[in-house]
């Protein structure tokens, strides 16, 4: 690696909105950042995710507008 061209690599403290704090190394240039979601509060990782059923919307659309295309 060339000397003097790489950014400084420092420890960064991340604080989540749920209160979880952790440190990681980065060339970000800041000493702390605020996160909205982390692995401790994200629904995918906590097992509290909801599955959104969009089939009802398609059925409603077909009921409202499906007959328009079949008229001749």
Curated annotation (Swiss-Prot):
GO CC entries: ribonucleoprotein complex; ribosome
Cofactor: Zn(2+)
BP term (GO), one: translation
Binding residue positions for Zn(2+): 16, 18, 38, 41
Record keyword Cell cycle present: no
HAMAP family membership: Ribosomal_bL31_1
Role this protein plays: Binds the 23S rRNA.
Quaternary assembly: Part of the 50S ribosomal subunit.
Protein name, as recorded: Large ribosomal subunit protein bL31
The organism of origin for this protein: Aliivibrio fischeri (strain ATCC 700601 / ES114)
């Amino acid at each position: 690696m060339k000397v003097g061209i790489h950014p400084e690599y420092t420890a960064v403290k991340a604080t989540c909105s749920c209160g979880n704090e952790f440190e990681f190394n980065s060339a970000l240039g800041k000493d702390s950042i605020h996160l909205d979601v982390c692995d401790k509060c994200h629904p995918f990782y906590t097992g509290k995710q909801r599955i959104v059923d969009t089939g009802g919307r398609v059925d409603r659309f077909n009921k409202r507008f499906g007959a328009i295309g079949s008229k001749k």
